[in-house]
């Protein structure tokens, strides 16, 4: 699929913050390069919340790209239905499934982090925490909507293909019957009785 998700670990230690991932995490680059205004790594909880924010934001950006790609494939499918476009839609649907799974897991992790007694949430973090919750919830809802729309679109195109096949079968049946009539007539007159 064009998009995929990877696990990410963030370790808060007294000496600093460590992030571990199986692949490139380009969404973290603004945090690591210091391009996020007002970010302090002194409070590890703030950094963790910013990571969640960046994750949700990256998913929303990816969702916009997926929606644009789906729209392009939809326009192609309106002209002619080929396997290439249908497979492209399937790839996008897989990506949306990965997004939804990852976002829901992130929401669950965020809820669990709030209950960890050893993490000391500063008052400043509470507003950011609420913002991150809203951003994650919005991303989850938008991905779910996009997934439903894509599923409905694929069902509609499947119905179109089925209708087209039915029309072709009707024509072929009619042609077969028409071609069978001369054979039937010749068979009747050609019998030796």
Kindly give the residue locations of the regions a language model identified:
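Hydrophobic alpha-helical transmembrane segments and their immediately adjacent juxtamembrane loops
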Residues: 134-193
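Peripheral, non-transmembrane regulatory/ligand-interaction domains of membrane transport proteins
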Residues: 1-122, 128-131, 135-142
